[in-house]
């Protein structure tokens, strides 16, 4: 009897404009030569993120599936994750050797979380342009995600945000939970996220 190993499912959430899709593009391009990947994106009325990732060449088009949630995007990743679970299952059946599936949420507030049925690991993305106060506002995305990404560090001087203050507040809110600054334009911080996914997700084990 062959036991089919299920792919690791990593949920990527965060507010609109924080850089979720840019992070996914960077992760896919950096990890696709090592691991068998696929992506599920969520948008309310369109499949815009699916299109962006496909046109960017993040993965082959058939490995990127867009889900139109048709309503509150939080519901589709938490209370009723059936559409996303179906997309994950379809990708797993289509590509029998999948090792990692990213599930991108459709733009969240700070209280959004992924259903444990849908995501084995969760990454939450915020950005410096939202203001240095964001980490101290808390919410499950800030405090409970498995890895917190603070993106767009290059914008700090332009928006009057102190990275030192953000670091202090993040450490206070998250304790020992891992997190990192990123500038996806330059690739700063990307390898830390990849290492986290590979180690905590026990890829290849």
UniProtKB/Swiss-Prot annotation:
Belongs to the SIMIBI class G3E GTPase family. UreG subfamily. This is Urease accessory protein UreG. PANTHER family: UREASE ACCESSORY PROTEIN G. Gene3D superfamilies: P-loop containing nucleotide triphosphate hydrolases (3.40.50.300). Homodimer. UreD, UreF and UreG form a complex that acts as a GTP-hydrolysis-dependent molecular chaperone, activating the urease apoprotein by helping to assemble the nickel containing metallocenter of UreC. The UreE protein probably delivers the nickel. Keywords: Chaperone, Cytoplasm, GTP-binding, Nickel insertion, Nucleotide-binding. One of its GO terms (biological process) is urea catabolic process. InterPro entries: CobW/HypB/UreG_nucleotide-bd (IPR003495), P-loop_NTPase (IPR027417), UreG (IPR004400). One of its GO terms (molecular function) is nickel cation binding. NCBIfam families: ureG.
């Amino acid at each position: 009897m062959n036991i089919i190993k299920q792919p690791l499912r990593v949920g990527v959430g965060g507010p609109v404009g924080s850089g979720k899709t840019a992070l996914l593009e960077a992760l896919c391009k950096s990890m696709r030569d090592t691991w068998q990947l696929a992506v599920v994106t969520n948008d309310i009325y369109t499949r815009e993120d699916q299109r962006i990732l496909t046109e960017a060449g993040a993965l082959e088009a058939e490995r990127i599936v867009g889900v139109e949630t048709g309503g509150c995007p939080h519901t589709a990743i938490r209370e009723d994750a059936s559409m996303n679970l179906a997309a994950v299952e379809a990708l797993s059946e289509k590509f029998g050797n999948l090792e990692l599936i990213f599930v991108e949420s459709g733009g969240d507030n700070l209280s959004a979380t992924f259903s444990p049925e849908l995501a084995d690991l969760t990454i939450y993305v915020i950005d410096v342009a939202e203001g240095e106060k964001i980490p101290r506002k808390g919410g499950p995305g800030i405090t409970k995600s498995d890895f917190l990404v603070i993106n767009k560090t290059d914008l700090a001087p332009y928006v009057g945000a102190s990275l030192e203050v953000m670091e202090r507040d993040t450490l206070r809110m998250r304790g020992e939970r891992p997190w990192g600054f990123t500038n996806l334009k330059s690739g700063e911080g990307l390898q830390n996220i990849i290492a986290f996914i590979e180690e905590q997700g026990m890829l290849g084990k």
